[in-house]
């Protein structure tokens, strides 16, 4: 094979290589356009809610003039905070999973302004059977909120008691926790929530400081009206474990800080 033939073959191979590169580039661009198109269509689909009252609550969170029929996936994915109020309003909590990027969630009035409940008729009582269903749903839904940093629950009106919060052990990003007016006695899940800095357990059934002391980064602790707050030995051990934390024992007693400075 002479030199000219060799050069022709090399030139031909280069042309083929360039053609292959163009085909590959075109395929990549086409794929990206298709992926973007599919993503756009998905995000702009209308959401189908399972519970009409949750649909209303989520729509109201998105904006004051938003109707459930107009809510799209891009809208629910943008929600960072959700306060669903009394659980008695709902048949199911499944729609919470639509808000997959939640950072803060309040359940059964955790964070509600309860003075808006003017009479007992405003309180929606949940049966024990329904409360068990809600507990199972929360156990499935809450750990899936991978960005969740604040969880709040209150049974202030004694209308729906969630007695098992072990599902929170999977919420490793939690920084703020509120479990108030609850009959739960098991707080062992706290050992897995290493990032918590602020915890409020007022009117809960916590009886000793052991589980709290497993949290090394606590800055604020509220144990109003708990068995723990009435045990001076346990309170002293808690103060020793967190010498720089604000520890709220009762409305007129705060440990580790000068109340006058507040």
For each feature predicted by the language model, list its residue ranges.
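N-terminal Lys/Arg-rich, disordered targeting/topogenic segments
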Residues: 1-20
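Hydrophobic alpha-helical membrane-insertion segments, chiefly the h-region
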Residues: 31-41
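Surface-exposed cap/linker segments adjacent to membranes
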Residues: 42-68
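Concave beta-strand-loop units of leucine-rich repeat
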Residues: 63, 77-141, 147-167, 173-185, ...
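Short, structural beta-strand-to-alpha-helix junction motif
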Residues: 71-73
């Amino acid at each position: 094979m002479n030199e000219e033939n060799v050069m022709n073959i090399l030139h031909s191979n280069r042309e083929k290589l360039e053609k292959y590169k163009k085909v590959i580039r075109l395929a990549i661009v086409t794929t990206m356009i298709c992926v973007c198109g599919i993503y756009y269509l998905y995000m702009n689909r209308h959401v189908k809610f399972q519970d009409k009252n949750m649909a209303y609550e989520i729509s109201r969170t998105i904006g004051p003039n938003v109707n459930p029929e107009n809510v799209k996936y891009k809208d629910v994915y943008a929600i960072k905070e959700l306060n669903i109020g009394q659980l008695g309003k709902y048949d199911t909590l499944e729609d919470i999973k639509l808000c997959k990027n939640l950072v803060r969630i309040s359940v059964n009035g955790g964070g509600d302004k309860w003075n808006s409940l003017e009479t007992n008729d405003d309180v929606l009582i949940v049966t024990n059977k329904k409360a068990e269903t809600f507990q199972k749903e929360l156990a499935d839904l809450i750990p899936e909120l991978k960005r969740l940093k604040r969880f709040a629950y209150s049974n202030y009106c004694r209308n729906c008691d969630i007695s098992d919060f072990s599902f929170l052990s999977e919420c490793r990003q939690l920084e703020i926790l509120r479990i108030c007016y609850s009959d739960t006695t098991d707080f062992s899940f706290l050992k897995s929530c290493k990032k918590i800095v602020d915890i409020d357990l007022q009117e809960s059934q916590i009886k000793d400081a052991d589980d709290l002391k497993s949290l090394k980064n606590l800055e604020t602790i509220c144990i109003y009206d708990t068995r723990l707050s009435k045990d001076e030995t346990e309170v002293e051990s808690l103060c020793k474990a967190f010498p720089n934390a604000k520890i709220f024992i009762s409305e007129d007693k705060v440990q580790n800080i000068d109340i006058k400075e507040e």
